[in-house]
Regions:
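A cross-family "folded-core" feature that marks the main globular domain of proteins
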Residues: 2-171
Length: 171
């Protein structure tokens, strides 16, 4: 998955994730996720989005995975992962946006574990904090985003895991 420039493109909606996300096909008939405020509002399959603007983020999908995204990932987790990626880009510049789906999945499972009182430890948290200090600081921002958006607070161990996602996107 990679990020594309979206300002001057045309997209056909395949399906709506929520008010802030759609799965669409670009001009080359490739599946993408478009995320940004209001991009999915009152959209339905077949709608055309012309020149969505610079505030919309576009992520390329592997061939024929758009339907899986529509069925498998709660859009709130995509939005949260997108917000974390945008924050990481402010700190580091360009990063590999293929972490969107794995990061969204990780956050979803983290919240599921919290809801079910399951604790998972990360024996490498101290090492991650030292070796990847900048990534860890960005991941601490993820804690605030998750708390604000979902009302749950992730542990330091989860911050360590999110740091690894961010580090992978920089490598």
């Amino acid at each position: 998955m990679k990020e594309n420039k979206v300002e001057k493109q045309r997209y056909e909606v395949i399906g709506t994730l929520n008010n802030n996300g759609v799965v669409a096909k670009d001009e080359l008939n490739k599946e993408v996720i478009l995320l940004g405020k209001g991009i999915g509002f009152k959209r339905k399959a077949g709608d055309v989005i012309e020149n969505p603007g610079k505030n919309i983020k576009c992520y390329s999908l592997e061939k024929n995975t758009g339907k899986n995204v529509l069925q498998g990932v709660d859009p709130i987790f995509l939005e949260i992962a997108n917000e974390i990626i945008r924050y990481a880009e402010k700190e580091f510049g360009d990063i590999d946006t293929k972490i969107l789906l794995p990061l969204a999945d990780h956050i979803a499972f983290s919240i599921d574990r919290i809801k079910n009182d399951m604790v998972i430890s990360n024996p490498l948290t101290s090492d991650i904090r030292l070796l990847f200090a900048d990534e860890y600081e960005v991941a601490k921002k993820a804690r605030k985003i998750i708390k604000r958006r979902l009302g749950y607070e992730i542990t330091d161990d989860e911050i360590g895991y999110i740091s690894l996602h961010i580090h992978a996107a920089l490598s």
